[in-house]
């Protein structure tokens, strides 16, 4: 709240714990500060030939859906997962997010695993009233075609696209426009001070026009990835986004 935000996108791995007392503390702290808890961003990986591994990721996702419900959060950031044939994230970024398919399998296998896994999470999402927002992240959703292949195959009101403005490294505006109609949540990257792996000079007025054209009326969540001190970088980013989106 002190930095000028209206809401908080909670990163699950940064939560201190998951006790009822801690969840109540987060809810009350947000309410007392006049901010809304808007999304629970979680990590899972459905791109694995081992069914037991996929089942553990399904269970984790369903567990996080229940956490979101307890926190009064309406959206969960979902990942498709990736092949994990690249040993480090630094190397993956050096390779522009592209990695080889696991030997002995095909891209279709990965999509089948991911689609089947997300389908198993949907009853819990519907029961909790929590929308799953699949991010254009690394792995199967690195391209708009990959993201839309999953969302369109499932075709559920409880699954949509999460537009991360900084994850299409080439021709971003054309690709963002391709997923805009399916977008239910937006994470907007800024890079003041330079990014950790890369820096994009994003035209946010242009992105705002893309979203407006597709009647997007949801949240714009700042994802600050710059090296500048967040005490100055975050307020600067929020001012820039408010100006671009007319808020």
Language model segments and positions:
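Conserved beta-strand positions in the central sheet of alpha/beta enzyme cores
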Residues: 9, 39-41, 77, 133, ...
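Glycine-rich, proline-tolerant flexible connector loops at the mouths of alpha/beta enzymes
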Residues: 9-27, 82-87
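Active-site-proximal loop/turn and secondary-structure-junction residues that shape catalytic pockets
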Residues: 12-14, 44-46, 80-84, 138-140, ...
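Residues that cap or flank secondary-structure elements
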Residues: 17-18, 56, 113, 139, ...
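Short, small-residue-rich loop/turn micro-motifs
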Residues: 34, 41, 80-82, 183, ...
């Amino acid at each position: 709240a002190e930095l000028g935000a209206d809401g908080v996108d909670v990163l699950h791995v940064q939560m201190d714990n998951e006790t009822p007392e801690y969840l109540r503390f987060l809810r009350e702290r947000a309410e007392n500060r006049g901010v809304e808890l808007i999304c629970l961003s979680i990590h899972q990986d459905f791109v694995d030939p081992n069914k037991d591994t996929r089942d553990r990721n399904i269970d984790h996702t369903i567990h996080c859906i229940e956490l979101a419900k307890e926190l009064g959060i309406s959206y969960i950031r979902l990942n498709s997962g990736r092949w994990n044939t690249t040993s480090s994230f630094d190397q993956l970024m050096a390779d522009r997010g592209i990695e080889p398919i696991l030997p002995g399998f095909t891209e279709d296998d990965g999509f089948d695993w991911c689609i089947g896994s997300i389908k198993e999470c949907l009853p819990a999402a519907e029961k909790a009233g929590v929308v799953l927002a699949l991010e254009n992240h690394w792995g199967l959703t690195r391209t708009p075609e990959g993201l839309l292949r999953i969302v369109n195959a499932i075709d559920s009101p409880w699954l949509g696209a999460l537009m991360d403005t900084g994850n299409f490294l080439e021709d971003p505006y054309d690709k963002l426009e391709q997923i805009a109609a399916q977008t239910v949540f937006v994470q907007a990257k800024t890079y003041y001070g330079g990014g950790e792996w890369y820096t994009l000079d994003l035209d946010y007025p242009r992105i705002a026009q893309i979203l407006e054209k597709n009647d997007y009326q949801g949240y714009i969540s700042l994802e600050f990835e710059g090296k500048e001190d967040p005490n100055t970088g975050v307020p600067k980013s929020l001012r820039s986004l408010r100006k671009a989106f007319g808020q």
